[in-house]
Amino acid sequence: MKKILAVIAASVYLMSPSANAQTITGAGATFPYPVYSKWSEAYQVKTDIQLNYQSIGSSGGIKQIKAATVDFGATDAPLKGEELTASGLVQFPTVLGGVVPIINIEGIKPGELQLTGDVLAKIFVGHIVVWNDKRIQELNPKLKLPDANITIVHRADGSGTTFIFTDYLSEVSTVWKEEVGKGAAVKWPATSSVAGKGNEGVAANVARVKNSIGYVEYAYAKKNKMTYAKLQNRDGKYVDPDDLTFAAAAAGADWFSTPGMGISLVNQKGAQSWPITGATFILMYREPKNAKNSQETIKFFDWAFVNGGKLAADLDYVPLPKAVTDRIRSDVWTQIKK
């Protein structure tokens, strides 16, 4: 719990700027906060450029960039082409990661509980309400699951992590698609539920509430040593979340088929694919108010694309393919006025 609270406390200022450091500002998704933090620390050592990133959720990041109060917004729920055009924004991905179900069931270790997408959806929609429900028990015949009510933990804020998670549930469950649907914020149907702000808040609540289940970006689960569930993927294989299964899900992605590269990576084919994989995105103005800071923002992410791969991989994020970063340099950043 102390580690989770430490992440929350650190979520506004990534490092303390030196007296002469230039500061670039961003706000939005909590999904990439751990890797942006590591990139910022390393980049400031090299350049003395300070990144002030507010980890406030994707919806907040979109609002902040549209209000022109930050140099960039960050979202895991990509904007569509028409919204980008209408807002005068460009969009590009920075890194890939996975969303994982996390649980707090006494005696259950990470990866021991196995769930299908359909059963996961039925839990979150409120059709399965106890852990020893036969539909869960049949998937886990060797586990002794408690006769205890399930508490759902979800995001309180508009969230790209929620967008990725509900996008997946909509892909694998007709019931979820018809009753709830996908979005950065949805009306959660389960009656026994607790809301948390940010990935940090969801992780903290799952750690606190016995017999609960929630969803977070994998780096939060790993950092806080939380128990995750294995998921059955589209090929019928049960897989663990890690950088290899996230990369497998993105292997066949057609990045250039959608404006702003806003593709969905959930429920992809492949025996090794993690089914709840997603990219996180940056939003910037084509004609920024502060051109100098916009160019420094570009330099920061360019440095990260070249030098930040190991830092990302250490946190089980997946760096973008070179073809994607090359296209970002040639087709996206060139649209931003200097």
What are these regions (language model features)?
Residues A21-K338:
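Flexible loop/hinge segments at secondary-structure junctions
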Residues K2-I8, P17:
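Sec-dependent signal peptide recognition
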Residues K2, S11-V12, D48:
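Generic N-terminal initiation segments characterized by hydrophobic and/or small/turn-forming residues
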Residues V12-N20:
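C-terminal segment of classical bacterial N-terminal signal peptides
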Residues M1-K2, A86:
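Residues that act as N-cap/strand-start positions at coil-to-secondary-structure junctions
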